[in-house]
């Protein structure tokens, strides 16, 4: 770091993203991207005519996308705010609803950016341990007196709470915002969007990166009552008014409209997840009951970090977290059937099955 860095940032530990190799030699099962390309409707929407309009700023109100999203989710446009990836939605929410005297509560094993953002913005953390089996006890979050963020389904475990459990947390914290990060909800979770009109303290965040094949476009949505969304827009228009580029606005709108492609690709991933889990368990792995587009697995036959390295040597990238309680586990993105068969073949060679 330079001698000019603010003292407030010197102890911040940045987030470590998954590896993004710039060549094609790896089977990439490490960052929970979709193995399928964007919808053909997206390719049509991002036309030459739209590219030529890149000389112009994008619509800061994101009106066309909001109208499409409102119709899709059964909400009003004023109940939705697009973000430059759901990370921006989440960051804006923490900026709006937390500060040095208003902490953020989250699980000890969950999406790593929550803790990073707390460090960046000097927000106190209330870290709530998951149970020994990595499940979350909703009653641990009752009456906390803090803003709460829940990844549901959780990452990296893939486990999910039913909507009724989230509703219990909402009822037990009427004076605090409860943020539900639904990045993986389309693969088997139960969305809390239907609860938005019932709970003024509920903010739901979703992404286009997983089930809608737009990780590289960076688009997310925050959804809640109109006053919460107005709070987020206060942050947005104080920081980054043109936060969604023109091509992403068009791509996101087209992705929402092509429900048939969404259903087909989602079903394919869920089916592949099912038989991959069975194959891993047949090889002696412990595999959690994922409701996401990845599996969280471990084996007593080899340390998680060592297995990650051996797989990488064989051209297969998975995610290993060198962290308490989960160091022996791997997070494995669900790819195409051929990619998962290649993973299993590599594991057989490493473990000498």
Model-assigned labels for residue ranges:
Residues 1-56, 143-144:
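N-terminal "arm"/small-domain region of PLP-dependent enzymes with the aminotransferase-like
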Residues 126, 130-186:
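Active-site phosphate-binding strand-loop segment of PLP-dependent enzymes
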Residues 270, 282-314, 330:
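Conserved PLP-binding catalytic core of the aspartate aminotransferase-like
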Residues 201-281, 285-288:
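PLP-dependent aminotransferase class I/II
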Residues 63-103, 121, 301:
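Phosphate-binding glycine-rich loop
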Residues 164, 309-314, 319, 323-353:
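PLP-dependent enzyme catalytic core of the Aspartate aminotransferase-like
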Residues 79, 91-133, 139:
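PLP-dependent aspartate aminotransferase-fold enzymes
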């Amino acid at each position: 770091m330079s001698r000019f860095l603010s003292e407030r940032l010197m102890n911040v530990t940045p987030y470590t993203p998954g590896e993004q190799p710039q060549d094609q030699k790896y089977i990439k099962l490490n960052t929970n991207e979709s193995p399928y390309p964007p919808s053909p409707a997206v390719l049509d929407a991002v036309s030459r005519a739209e590219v030529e309009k890149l000389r112009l700023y994008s619509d800061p109100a994101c009106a066309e996308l909001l109208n499409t999203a409102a119709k899709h989710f059964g909400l009003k446009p004023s109940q939705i705010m697009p973000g430059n990836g759901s990370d921006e939605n989440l960051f804006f929410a923490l900026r709006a609803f937390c500060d040095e005297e208003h902490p953020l509560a989250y699980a000890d094993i969950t999406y790593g950016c929550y803790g990073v953002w707390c460090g960046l913005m000097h927000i106190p953390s209330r870290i709530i341990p998951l149970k020994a089996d990595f499940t979350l006890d909703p009653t641990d979050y009752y009456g906390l007196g803090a803003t709460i963020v829940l990844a549901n389904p959780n990452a990296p475990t893939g486990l999910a709470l039913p909507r009724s459990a989230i509703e219990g947390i909402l009822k037990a914290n009427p004076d605090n915002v409860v943020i539900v990060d639904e990045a993986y909800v389309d693969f088997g979770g139960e969305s809390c969007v239907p609860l938005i009109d019932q709970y003024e303290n509920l903010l739901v965040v979703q992404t286009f990166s997983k089930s809608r094949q737009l990780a590289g476009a960076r688009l997310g949505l925050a959804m809640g009552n109109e006053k919460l969304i107005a709070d987020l827009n206060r942050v947005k228009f104080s920081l980054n008014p043109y936060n969604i580029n023109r091509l992403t606005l068009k791509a996101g709108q087209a992705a929402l409209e092509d429900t048939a492609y969404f259903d087909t690709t989602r079903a394919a991933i869920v089916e592949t997840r099912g038989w991959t889990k069975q194959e891993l368990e047949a090889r002696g792995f412990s595999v959690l009951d994922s409701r996401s587009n990845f599996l969280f697995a471990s084996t007593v036959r080899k340390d998680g970090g060592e297995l990650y390295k051996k797989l990488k040597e064989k051209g297969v990238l998975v995610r290993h977290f060198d962290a308490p309680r989960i160091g022996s586990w791997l997070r494995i993105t669900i790819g195409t059937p051929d990619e998962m068969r290649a993973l299993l073949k590599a594991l057989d060679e490493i473990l000498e099955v």
